[in-house]
Curated annotation (Swiss-Prot):
It is an enzyme of class 3 (hydrolase). One of its GO terms (molecular function) is metal ion binding. Keywords: Cytoplasm, Endonuclease, Hydrolase, Metal-binding, Nuclease, Nucleus, tRNA processing, Zinc. The gene is ELAC1. Its cofactor is Zn(2+). Its EC number is 3.1.26.11. It comes from Homo sapiens. PANTHER family: ZINC PHOSPHODIESTERASE ELAC PROTEIN 1 (PTHR46018:SF2). This is Zinc phosphodiesterase ELAC protein 1. CDD domains: RNaseZ_ZiPD-like_MBL-fold (cd07717).
């Protein structure tokens, strides 16, 4: 199963001609999951090879405008492009408490009627995710007058034992959220692909006398088969080792993680996407505003033993490599060096708009 990540917006605070506001798409076999939806995300989608109509899930890390102000417009555009296709499955939206009310208000005030259904699942933050004076209590409201296309979502509480939030667990993936520290409650997301059955051992099948055909499919799917001679063949008799799934972790704005949930969920991630708003020389300023530097991001990646670190959410002062001036000592290339110095020169990737990173199947 193919899997890749496309960066639609890699800039902080606001969209610019060189970097869009925060938005990342994880694509699995054509289905797209959107992580954050800053202003202008739908325009970035149109410039990419992705299709907005393929989006089935949306994850919002926190309620700062550069991470979710593009959401109402995107939903409207998907609706317009859907025509009368009312059979479309509901779009699942995950984010902090208050997100459902925001979507409801914008749809109500703009008299918008979507042609598809959507459902908002809200994560309830804890008080230690932001400075005390910035914490606002948003009640999860179950309205009788909800928009006609909105289905009832869940209120998701922290699992205190796991130190994480279980968003969903299906046949292919387990997706969880973990707490981050920022000026307002922020979250990171861990997407883990489940193990898949190993390949059939052709030689063993032959030796055991299993005839080619339907029996192969059953064994591949974990079902035992009985041969004509009465011998039962179990899947473990003929299957090679299971294929370990891939892990992608995407963090919202933060100056650190809260609890050990983030470290556990991001451990040995195949791809870790972490913000690095400012360079290391401005670490105090970054922390003051709830942000990270390359050194901070790399330190977390090293703690998690992440296999690949990608930095994003750069201050708009840091232009993409192709636009950087020759001889600059405080440009984007310096951020790469700062992160790599922590990771013993392990290569670090600097995200740019429309960059696509493939996550290959593990051998």
């Amino acid at each position: 199963m193919s899997m890749d990540v496309t960066f639609l917006g890699t800039g902080a605070a606001y969209p610019s001609p060189t970097r869009g506001a925060s938005a990342v798409v994880l694509r699995c076999e054509g289905e797209c999951w959107l992580f954050d939806c800053g202003e202008g995300t739908q325009t970035q989608l149109m410039k990419s090879q992705l299709k907005a109509g393929r989006i089935t899930k949306i994850f919002i890390t926190h309620l700062h405008g550069d991470h979710f102000f593009g959401l109402p417009g995107l939903l409207c555009t998907i609706s317009l492009q859907s025509g009368s296709m009312v059979s479309k499955q509901p779009i699942e939206i995950y984010g902090p408490v208050g997100l459902r009310d925001f979507i409801w208000r914008t749809m109500e005030l703009s008299h918008t009627e979507l042609v598809f259904h959507y459902v908002v699942h809200e994560l309830v933050p804890t008080a230690d995710q932001c400075p005390a004076e910035e914490l606002k209590e948003f009640a999860h409201v179950n309205r009788a007058d909800s928009p006609p296309k909105e289905e009832q979502g869940r209120t998701i509480l922290l699992d205190s034992e796991e130190n994480s939030y279980l968003l969903f667990d299906d046949e292919q993936f387990v997706v969880k959220a973990f707490r981050l520290f920022h000026r307002i409650p922020s979250f990171g997301f861990s997407v883990v692909e489940k193990k898949r059955p190993g390949k059939l051992n052709a030689q063993k099948l032959k030796d055991l006398g299993v005839p080619p055909g339907p029996a192969y499919g059953k064994l591949k799917n974990g079902i035992s088969v009985v041969l004509e001679n009465g011998v039962t063949i179990s899947p473990q008799d003929v299957l090679k080792k299971p294929i370990v799934g891939r892990k992608i972790c995407i963090l919202g704005d933060c100056s650190g993680v809260v609890g050990d949930g983030g470290v556990k969920l991001c451990f040995e991630a195949d791809l870790l996407i972490h913000e690095a708003t400012l360079d290391d020389a401005q670490m105090d300023k970054a922390k003051e505003h709830g942000h990270s530097t390359p050194q901070m991001a790399a330190t977390f990646a090293k703690l998690c033993r992440a296999k690949r670190l990608v930095l994003t959410h750069f201050s708009q002062r840091y232009k993409p490599v192709a636009l950087a001036r020759e001889g600059e000592t405080d440009g984007i290339a310096e951020l790469k060096k700062q992160a790599e110095s922590v990771l013993d020169l392990q290569e670090v990737t600097l995200a740019e708009d429309f960059m696509v990173i493939s996550i290959p199947i593990k051998k």
